[in-house]
């Protein structure tokens, strides 16, 4: 293995060899459903990262060789001037995506004072795709418990325990602590597991639902949900039990956003109210997607534009037009 650091532009910290195992994508049961059009992963060039920021790409299989699927690189960002007390932001991409797709949002997190991890995970199918058609509202709880913590039975997805989000994050933090001991990544672990009280969780689409579920089940530093977590039975509009349950994370730490024109805007607005997210902590995005985007026809570009590079609108200077909204949602990591 070869470790490296870039201060000015995105680099590969752990060399990715030709023998890397490609992700074996999961297949939704109803591939023609509108719910399957959440997000497709475009190929794009990462923007430059400002000087003074270290960026790593690390394969999930390098931190845990038993992980064979969904093996696109995790992205790690650290600003040189961060104090030792800086907290951690973990971002989860949407369905079919990878962390690099939302690099500008990750950079915004680093600029807000967090150490940042964009975490790859099993995201071939989402909860609304899988459990939305299921008449059992608890399908969503089983789905997310298995995908995130690896400790529930769900016949609807084939995720393995070692592929769980918690295991991926735990193994990555241990790996980073060995790779860069002077950065003390072990501060974000307790008894070998993620120290959620020092971790802000954020995500887009399916990833927003991941962040929300973790916030419901663990006391985290902050929850940032970009257009996610509307788990319900579509035929009856009955919410998943976890949506209506009490939150382990105090509600004043919850933040969320959605686009007023995205197809599931009404569902998200209702879900955020049921969860109890303070109305002052919710941003409704209104700008048109970047007209130069290269996304396939038929996708909900308003939904994708919340954080995805090439679709997120830009200002007159070519910078993300939602920068101020992102900064509000992120708060301070220091």
What residue spans do the PLM features occupy?
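Bacterial N-terminal signal peptides
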Residues: 6-17
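The feature captures the conserved acid-bearing segment of alpha/beta-hydrolase catalytic domains
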Residues: 80-81, 221-314
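Short beta-strand element of the alpha/beta-hydrolase
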Residues: 85-94
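Serine-hydrolase catalytic machinery in alpha/beta-hydrolase-like enzymes
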Residues: 94-192
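Catalytic active-site module of serine/aspartate enzymes centered on a nucleophile-bearing elbow/loop
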Residues: 300-334
């Amino acid at each position: 293995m070869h470790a490296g650091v870039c201060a000015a532009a995105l680099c590969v910290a752990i060399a990715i060899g030709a023998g890397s195992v490609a992700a074996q994508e999961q297949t939704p049961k109803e591939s023609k459903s509108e719910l399957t059009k959440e997000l497709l992963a475009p190929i794009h060039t990462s923007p430059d990262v400002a000087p003074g920021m270290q960026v790593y790409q690390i394969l999930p299989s390098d931190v845990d060789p038993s992980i064979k699927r969904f093996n696109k690189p995790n992205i790690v960002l650290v600003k040189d001037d961060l104090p030792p007390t800086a907290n951690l932001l973990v971002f989860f991409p949407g369905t079919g995506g990878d962390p690099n797709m939302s690099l500008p949002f990750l950079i915004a997190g680093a600029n807000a004072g967090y150490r940042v991890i964009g975490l790859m995970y099993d995201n071939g199918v989402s909860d609304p795709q899988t459990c939305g058609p299921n008449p059992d509202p608890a399908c969503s709880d089983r789905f997310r418990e298995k995908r995130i913590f690896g400790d529930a039975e769900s016949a609807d997805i084939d995720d393995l325990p070692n592929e769980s989000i918690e295991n991926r994050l735990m193994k990555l933090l241990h790996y980073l602590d060995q790779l860069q001991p002077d950065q003390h990544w072990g501060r974000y672990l307790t008894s070998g597991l993620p120290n959620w009280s020092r971790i802000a969780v954020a995500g887009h689409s399916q990833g927003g639902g991941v962040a929300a579920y973790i916030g419901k089940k663990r006391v985290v530093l902050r929850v940032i949900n970009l257009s996610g977590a509307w788990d319900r039975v579509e035929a009856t509009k009955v919410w998943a039990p976890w949506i209506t349950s009490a939150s382990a994370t105090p509600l004043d730490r919850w933040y969320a956003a959605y686009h007023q024109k995205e197809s599931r805007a009404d569902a998200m607005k209702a879900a955020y109210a049921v969860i109890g997210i303070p109305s002052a902590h919710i941003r409704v995005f209104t700008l048109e997607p970047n007209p130069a985007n290269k996304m396939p026809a038929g996708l909900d570009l308003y939904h994708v534009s919340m954080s995805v590079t090439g679709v997120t609108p830009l200002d007159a200077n070519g910078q993300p037009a939602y920068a101020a909204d992102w900064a509000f949602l992120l708060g301070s990591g220091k």
